[in-house]
Curated annotation (Swiss-Prot):
GO annotations of cellular component type: small ribosomal subunit
HAMAP family: Ribosomal_uS7_B (MF_00480_B)
Pfam family, one: Ribosomal_S7
Family of the protein in this entry: Belongs to the universal ribosomal protein uS7 family.
Protein name as annotated: Small ribosomal subunit protein uS7
GO molecular function terms listed in the Swiss-Prot or TrEMBL record: rRNA binding; structural constituent of ribosome; tRNA binding
GO terms, biological process: translation
Length: 156
């Protein structure tokens, strides 16, 4: 926490081709070592593959995938009387999007296909069809929250 007041959030500019803020954030999540051009090539290449295979607008497929990945609930550790409890809490909309993108990129990198473009395209299509590792992560998070529902009264 900063001592001198709140630091204003920097706005992310919409991506130049699709005009979408979420796509711009995906590009920033994929980016490594400040190589934005490479990240854009990966994302736009994956969108081309999605357009080819799904024969739909790739941005709509991506947004559908994001809706399937974004968690509604998560658990947060809370110490009460010497014991740690996993307390289920609702996820703020901004954090939902951030977690969704983070999980999408993490499980994309863990896939077995050759080339990041192919991996990203397949992970997005899997997520849009409610399958894939990133959707499983969301379901596991929700199961964890459901299992710890008894501790919901410890919310702060």
């Amino acid at each position: 926490m900063p001592r001198k007041g709140n630091v204003p959030k920097r706005e992310v500019l919409a991506d130049p081709i699709h005009g979408s803020m979420v796509v711009a954030k995906l590009i920033n999540s994929v980016m490594l070592d400040g190589k934005k051009g490479t990240a854009q090539n990966i994302v736009y290449g994956a969108f081309d593959i999605i357009k080819e295979r799904a024969e739909e607008n790739p941005v709509e497929v991506f947004e559908k995938a994001m809706n399937n990945i974004m968690p509604v609930l998560e658990v947060k550790a809370r110490r009460v009387g010497g014991a740690n409890y996993q307390v289920p809490i609702e996820v703020r909309p901004e954090r939902r999007q951030t977690l969704g993108l983070r999980w999408l990129v993490k499980y994309t990198r863990a896939r077995g296909e050759k080339g990041m473009i192919e991996k990203l395209a397949k992970e997005i299509m899997d997520a849009a069809n409610n399958t894939g590792s990133s959707v499983k992560k969301k379901e596991d998070t929700h199961k964890m929250a459901e299992a710890n529902k008894a501790f919901a009264h410890y919310r702060w």
